[in-house]
C-alpha cells in the first residue's frame, strides 16, 4: 500500500482560493470551486473540491506550494528536485522552480545553477505570472522575484533575505518577506518594518490604497497596515500570523499560537474599521496544528492548514 503523507505535507504548504461560479436556479446562490495545492509522497498535487490530481513532474521529489486561478486557467507553483547524474540518490540534489498552467509544467532554474532554490507564492495579473521565493549564491539566501520565468533579485546576498508572498495591484508589485527583519518590496524598492532578525513577514494583501502585511516579531503575531504595527497576541506564547485576506472593511488573519508545547491553529477577525479583534481557536491542544492560508468570499471563510 502506498504511504500517503497528505496530511503532514500537502496542507502544510497549501494555498487556497475559491474560483469560478455558476448560478443555481433553485436558490440563486453562487457555487464555488475550491483549489488546494500541496503534495503527497513524492508527487505534487492539486485538489479541486477535494478531488486529487497529480501534477506532471520528472518522477523525483516535487511539491506544489501555491495555487492561483485567473479566468478559466488554474496555475500552481512549486519545486522539483534535479539530480545532475541522472540518479535519484545523488548527494546533494538541486532544485528548480516549476509552475503549471492547467496541468502543463514549465521549469526555470536558479541563477547559480546549483543552489537551494525555493518558490513560496504565486500571483497572476494581466497574463503575467509572478513567483517569489529565494535562491542562494553564497552564505546568505537572496530574496527573488520571477516574472514569466525571468529572475530578478530583491536583495544582494549581504544579509539573510527571503520572499514569502506576492500581490499585484494595478501596475504595482508587492512582495513581503524577510531582510534581517520584516520587509516589504514595492516594485523592488525595499521598506524595512523592523530590524529584528527574529521577525519576518509571511503574507501581503492590497485593498484599495491600503497595504496589509502579517507575520511575527519575535514571539508575537503582528499585522502591519500601511507600515503601522498592531499586535495580534501579547507575546506570552509563541505565535505567528501566516496569511491575511481583506474583504471590504473586514480583515481575516490565520496562523497559530503555541500553548503547552502544542500549536493551536488560529483565526483573527476584525469586522469594520472601528471593530474589535475577535480571536477563534480552530483546533484544540490535543494535536499540533497550523493555519496557513485564508480566503473569504460571500461571507464564507476558507482556511487551510495542517
Model-derived features: where do they sit?
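Residue-level hotspots at or immediately adjacent to binding/recognition sites across diverse folds
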Residues: 27-306
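Bacterial N-terminal signal peptides that target proteins for export
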Residues: 1-9
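C-terminal motif of bacterial Sec signal peptides marking the signal peptidase cleavage site
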Residues: 17-20
